[in-house]
Amino acid sequence: MIHSLFLINCSGDIFLEKHWKSVVSQSVCDYFFEAQEKAADVENVPPVISTPHHYLISIYRDKLFFVSVIQTEVPPLFVIEFLHRVADTFQDYFGECSEAAIKDNVVIVYELLEEMLDNGFPLATESNILKELIKPPTILRSVVNSITGSSNVGDTLPTGQLSNIPWRRAGVKYTNNEAYFDVVEEIDAIIDKSGSTVFAEIQGVIDACIKLSGMPDLSLSFMNPRLLDDVSFHPCIRFKRWESERVLSFIPPDGNFRLISYRVSSQNLVAIPVYVKHSISFKENSSCGRFDITIGPKQNMGKTIEGITVTVHMPKVVLNMNLTPTQGSYTFDPVTKVLTWDVGKITPQKLPSLKGLVNLQSGAPKPEENPSLNIQFKIQQLAISGLKVNRLDMYGEKYKPFKGVKYVTKAGKFQVRT
C-alpha cells in the first residue's frame, strides 16, 4: 500500500524519508512542491495528488507535511487516517511533533515506522502496544543506551496485540487512580457588517487522561448528547450502546487519548461569545482614513473571555497607522500590512477599543473594500455548545477513582466583516 513516506518542513526541505518496498526517488516530491506553490495557503495544498506513476497523499500537522507515496489505488481517507496516527504517535512519544523532536529521536522514529507498517500495510498503530515494543525516550534510558549500545526495542512481545482490546495493555497498576476529561471546542464563524451570523459551526473534541489500574469498564453520560453531529469515535467505544442510549461505554486505553471528536452545525445552537463595533472609513482623494473598533462580551455568557487577539490585514495602500488602544497593545507591520491588537481579557464594565488615523499613499485610489477582522479568544470552564458531562460510572474494579472534567472554548476561524 504505502511505498514511501517523506517528512517535509515549511521551507520545503525533506528532512526524513522512509521506504518500505523499493526506494522512491525524492524527485517524486517535485509534484507536491508544484501544488504547494499554487496553493494560497499551506492548508490548501490538495491532500491527493496524481502523478504519472504514483499518488501522493499528504497531511499538514504542526508545520510539517507528511507525504506518502502510493503506487496503486487505495482509499485516500485510509492513508490520511494512518498519517494522522503517525503524527499522534510522535506527539505521544516526544511531547511534540516537530522537526527538532523528530531529528533528536531519529532512531526511535525509524523503529516506530518499522513497527507501524509491515511491508507497507498498517500493523501496530495503538500507542499502548507500541510502547511495549519500543520504549519511549527518557534521559536515563538515552544515557544507558549510549553507554551499552542497546536500543529502545523491548525484549518481550506486547500483551494486547492479539486480544479483543488491543488498545489496552494488561497488568496496569497505579497508586493513584485518576480519570480526567477535557472538553475542547473551537467555534468557526463569519459575522457580517450588521452583526448578523452568516455562518457558525463548532468543532469539538473530548480528550481523556486515564490512569486506572486493572481492566476498568467506563460509562460516560451527557446532559444533552442529542446536539452532537458527525461524531468520530476512538475504537474502544461501543457504538451500539451510543446509538441506542447516547452513552459512551468503553474499556479505555492507558494514558492520554482522544475519546471522540464531534461537530455542532445547527446555527441556532451556536452562541457567538463576542461582538465587535467597527467603523473603518477611507475618504476619496485623501491620504488618511479613520479606524475605530470596540470589542465586548455577549451579556449571556457569564464567563471571562481571555487571550483576545484581533488581526487585521490592511489594504496595500496603507503606509502606517497611528492608533490609541484603551487596553492592551498593538503592532502594525508596514511590510505585510498586518495590524495585531493584543487585547487580553475583557469584562462588560470596561470595553476595550482601538481608534485612530490610517495613513495612505498619496495619490493612491481609495481601497475598494474594508478589511475583515480575525479574532482569537479563549473561554475557560465553558463549552460553547452547551455540552455537559452528567456522570462517569466505572465497572469491573472495586476502587474509587478521582474524576474531573475541564471545559475550554477557543476561536477557530472567527471572522468579522467590516
UniProtKB/Swiss-Prot annotation:
GO terms for biological process: anterograde axonal transport; anterograde synaptic vesicle transport; clathrin-coated vesicle cargo loading, AP-3-mediated; endocytosis; intracellular transport; melanosome assembly; platelet dense granule organization; postsynaptic neurotransmitter receptor internalization. Belongs to the adaptor complexes medium subunit family. This is AP-3 complex subunit mu-1. Residues 176-417 form the MHD domain. The keyword Membrane applies. Disulfide bonds: none annotated. PROSITE patterns: CLAT_ADAPTOR_M_1, CLAT_ADAPTOR_M_2, MHD. Adaptor protein complex 3 (AP-3) is a heterotetramer composed of two large adaptins (delta-type subunit AP3D1 and beta-type subunit AP3B1 or AP3B2), a medium adaptin (mu-type subunit AP3M1 or AP3M2) and a small adaptin (sigma-type subunit APS1 or AP3S2). Interacts with AGAP1. AP-3 associates with the BLOC-1 complex. (Microbial infection) Interacts with human respiratory virus (HRSV) matrix protein; this interaction plays an essential role in trafficking the matrix protein in host cells. It is a peripheral membrane protein. The keyword Transport applies. Keywords: Cytoplasmic vesicle, Golgi apparatus, Host-virus interaction, Membrane, Protein transport, Transport. Part of the AP-3 complex, an adaptor-related complex which is not clathrin-associated. The complex is associated with the Golgi region as well as more peripheral structures. It facilitates the budding of vesicles from the Golgi membrane and may be directly involved in trafficking to lysosomes. In concert with the BLOC-1 complex, AP-3 is required to target cargos into vesicles assembled at cell bodies for delivery into neurites and nerve terminals. The gene is AP3M1. SUPFAM superfamilies: Second domain of Mu2 adaptin subunit (ap50) of ap2 adaptor (SSF49447), SNARE-like (SSF64356). GO terms for molecular function: small GTPase binding. Signal peptide: none annotated. GO terms for cellular component: AP-3 adaptor complex; axon cytoplasm; clathrin adaptor complex; cytoplasmic vesicle; cytoplasmic vesicle membrane; early endosome; Golgi apparatus; lysosomal membrane. It is found in: Golgi apparatus; Cytoplasmic vesicle membrane.
